[in-house]
Regions:
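Glycine/tyrosine- and acidic-biased, solvent-exposed loop/turn segments at the edges of beta-strands
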Residues: 16-116
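Bacterial Sec-dependent N-terminal signal peptides
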Residues: 1-25
Length: 116
């Protein structure tokens, strides 16, 4: 009986460790930028974007666990600038930033957004 209990405990530990494993992000140098890709535990891409001088730069795209786009964001040397798109279940919000400040928020038709 003790050995059965020991095997069950060992099995439970192995299951917990396997679920707790994280997939390491990847970083790829592209000229003066570094492309970063982050992953969910299930292996699907969570986020892709660029760094310049250790600051968020250019386009960043966040995905849900099913691989659908959640957010498209634009940074300029770590500063939120330009149009961001936040994708909901039945709508898309367009948020315009200038120097980290929200300038405008509006709902847009999905057909007007090319990445969906």
């Amino acid at each position: 009986m003790k050995s059965l209990t020991a095997y069950l405990v060992l099995f439970m530990l192995m299951v917990n460790v396997s679920f707790a494993q994280q997939i390491e992000p990847t970083f790829e140098k592209q000229n003066d930028l570094v492309k970063a890709t982050y992953y969910y535990e299930n292996g699907t891409i969570k986020e892709v974007g660029f760094f310049k001088d250790d600051k968020l730069h250019k386009q960043w795209i966040s995905y849900n666990k099913e691989g659908k786009i959640k957010v498209v964001a634009i940074y300029d040397n770590g500063v939120k600038n330009g149009k961001w798109y936040i994708v909901g279940e039945d709508h898309v919000k367009e948020v315009t930033y200038k120097s980290n400040k929200i300038i405008k928020v509006e709902e847009v038709d999905e057909s007007e957004v090319s990445f969906i």
